[in-house]
């Protein structure tokens, strides 16, 4: 059975053997439960199975590809024919999962944000090996005082350690995308800033970075009734811009926001 990549679903199948081998060598998945997101035609799936995982779950939205995967791998994998945005990852297994994902670029940031904001006190995964459009990956790993630094950088660094593994050229895919891709490794942090509601982190960073070229005075006054006092409490110069505040400062501001609201 042959299935053509669907542009509407952002499908680009990874075909580069060297890259495929590199991906499955990043973490030790032997005898572990693994989740693959967007397996497509099963190229990476084949390499994952060579590493002898205890169990391999795959989430594939495309009905045609789900049939292809069933024909190709039969009982070697557990196929979840659904949209990853609708899947509750914590219900897939009671074991921590090693996750691999060639995420559709049109929903990659939405997926990552969803996972980060829904992480409770216990992580449902022990590693995430995810592919992004290079431009998005650069935003995720960016440090403060950089023009790429923003909401994604802060959200990602809250509970996760993030590392770029490699950049991948368009010729490694079929069909070829028009842009470069990057592979990132995410692992859970042992210690992270405790917040009452993660959505407040999303809300406040959205307010600050929707005006990233403005000085901090305006977003401070939008978020806090006493913006100047809060800035003074944390020793923040309101003449700076949102990209000049490191992630820990934003976490403290969110906690202050939650404390003031009771």
From Swiss-Prot:
Entry similarity comment: Belongs to the class I-like SAM-binding methyltransferase superfamily. rRNA adenine N(6)-methyltransferase family. RsmA subfamily.
Pfam families assigned to the protein according to its UniProt record, in alphabetical order: RrnaAD
GO MF annotations, alphabetized: 16S rRNA (adenine(1518)-N(6)/adenine(1519)-N(6))-dimethyltransferase activity; RNA binding
Name assigned to this protein: Ribosomal RNA small subunit methyltransferase A
Top-rank lineage group of the source organism: Bacteria
Compartment annotation: Cytoplasm
Protein's job: Specifically dimethylates two adjacent adenosines (A1518 and A1519) in the loop of a conserved hairpin near the 3'-end of 16S rRNA in the 30S particle. May play a critical role in biogenesis of 30S subunits.
Keywords: Cytoplasm, Methyltransferase, RNA-binding, rRNA processing, S-adenosyl-L-methionine, Transferase
One GO cellular component term: cytosol
The EC number(s) this enzyme carries: 2.1.1.182
